[in-house]
Amino acid sequence: NILSHDVLRIERLITDYSQMLKDEVALSKEKMKKINIEPIIQSVVEDYNNIQTVKKNIKIHYENDGNEKYIINGIENRIEQIITNLLDNSISFSKEGQNIFVNISSSFDRKIIVKIIDEGQGFKENDTTKIFKRFYSNRPDKFGEHSGLGLNIVKNLVDLHNASIKATNRLSQKGASMEIIFPKV
């Protein structure tokens, strides 16, 4: 009886949390404005390089295709959160001394493409859409426990920006690639 009561309580908490996120998304849409995401992403990469060089000797390489502006309708701190969560994930699956690459580019069809590529172990699953589901985690025990919410939050924030995200394994080498495609303004 106590166990079923606790299960119901946890289900209510999850439902309340989901509703809170939906409400936040609705409010966030009102706060959207034209922003250049390039300096935001570059700043996050610089901050991480200062931390990770000391922590795991991981180097994060940043590159853009030379365009001056990468303008989207968005919310600055949410873009930071997307990049931060993805870098945290890449770092956690990377060994000491490995590299992570962050690229931003514009396409001819009015899209802005952000890629985060690591040299870690890559994804185990063939269907990488699973990794964006709430509470999904495939981490080996050696990586410690995680909530399985990080990539789900990323997916929700990407959706908020009317963007898309795709996870793939690198074909020629070990590692994973995350690609976000934003509509350009």
Q: Model-flagged regions — what are they?
A:
Residues 5-10:
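Short alpha-helical segment of the dimerization/phosphotransfer core of two-component systems
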Residues 25-30, 69-74:
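Conserved micro-motifs of the catalytic ATP-binding
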Residues 31-49:
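A conserved beta-strand-to-alpha-helix junction within the catalytic ATP-binding
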Residues 90-91:
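Short helix-loop "hinge" at the ATP-lid/N-box region of the Bergerat-fold HATPase_c
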Residues 123-135:
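Short conserved segment of the HATPase_c
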Residues 150, 154:
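Short alpha-helical Gxxx[C/S/T] motif in the catalytic ATP-binding
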